[in-house]
Amino acid sequence: MASIVVVGAGLGGMSAAFELRDTLGRDHSITVVGQGDRFAFTPSNPWVAIGWREPEATSLDAAECLARRGIAFNGSGVDRIDAQARQVHTGGGTVFGYDYLVICTGPKLAFDEIPGIGPDGHTQSICTLPHARRAWEQYQAFLDDPGPVVIGAVQGASCFGPAYEFAMIL
């Protein structure tokens, strides 16, 4: 029996875990390590930012969802990976040994690389569920005093689709 650890509980990590379970059956152990207890369906973030969906309607309890498929879950994040020992150390102190490691951590938002960019600067983001919720709040304030809007993505952005979708529905 192989032990597989999937690091990341977003679209990539959850999809990888489900595909592994379907392909390998239940003879192998699969554990997903994510950051937090909820799986957020990121493609719905533009809808949250415009008020078409509530954040609660676009996320699931990750442990519950994975358990139905016989997949273990730990939501305390990864502190470090010891490749020599084949171990994943979580932020909560749990150590998972593995035969195979799948890394699906997704993007790291780098708002600090451009002065003034990001939710704490002069722009809004829909990259995460909390960002989309904040964008909705800022959109409501904008409606009270409307003016020009610029929607786009900065250099190096890995995905322009959400910005285009948000522009089309706005």
Language model: regions and residue ranges:
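Beta1-alpha1 glycine-rich phosphate/pyrophosphate-binding loop at the start
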Residues: 2-72, 156-169
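Intrinsically disordered, low-complexity proline-rich regions
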Residues: 1-3, 146-147
